[in-house]
Amino acid sequence: MAVDEWLLETVVEPVLRVYRWSGEWGSLGCFGDFKQAEREIANVCWVRRYTGGGVVDHQNDWTYTFVIPSSEDVARSKGAESYRVIHQGLLLALNESLNPVLSDGSAAGGDSMCFRNPVCYDVVDSVGNKLAGAGQRRSKEGLLHQGSVAGSCDEIVSIDRSERLAAALAKEWGLEDLLPPPEVIASKVAARYGLDDWTRRR
């Protein structure tokens, strides 16, 4: 989470970050109810995201972040439109056997669990089961999109999915090692993401 916040603060070109969780983790949105999250998923470590959205169980998902500078049209578009554009790209990255489509939002019911509440432009299968969702946050620097796809995958599938998503979202792209300044990340963890008070604040 600290790396994602740093990416939003320093973004000058679009960045797609794909990562795995070490251990058993759940996350909740910036405005989520911590006690409700604990009732939904037991015996996990928790972190509060910098974005909105519901409760996500990261024990069995594929997690990515897409950060877009404010110089890009999609970063300045309304929330629903940026969500649609990014998830349209995600459709192309997912296995076609899943028959993924974008949700029209008609099944949204206000459930706190992300994958039980398909909102408009979430990725769902042919019968409406949610396959992918995300939370977003905007700043003067750009747009932070933190996404989760249901179901874990091995490294080969993850790399292929990452490359397909990058190709769907960009005319040109390349791979680079992401090396955030350790002291900056440590300070963000100490000030926010590593604090029990931050995680449990609502």
Predicted features along the sequence, with ranges:
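A contiguous pocket-lining binding segment that forms or flanks enzyme active sites
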Residues: 95, 99-156
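Short, conserved charged micro-motifs
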Residues: 38, 73-79, 155-161
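Residues forming anionic-ligand binding surfaces in small-molecule and nucleic-acid pockets
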Residues: 50-73, 145
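Generic non-transmembrane alpha-helical segments
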Residues: 6, 89-97, 164-172
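C-terminal accessory segment of soluble enzyme catalytic cores
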Residues: 124-125, 137-202
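Active-site loop/lid in soluble adenylation, ligation, and acyl-transfer enzymes
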Residues: 1-41, 48-49, 55, 170-202
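Contiguous, small/hydrophobic- and glycine-enriched helical/loop subdomains that border
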Residues: 63-110
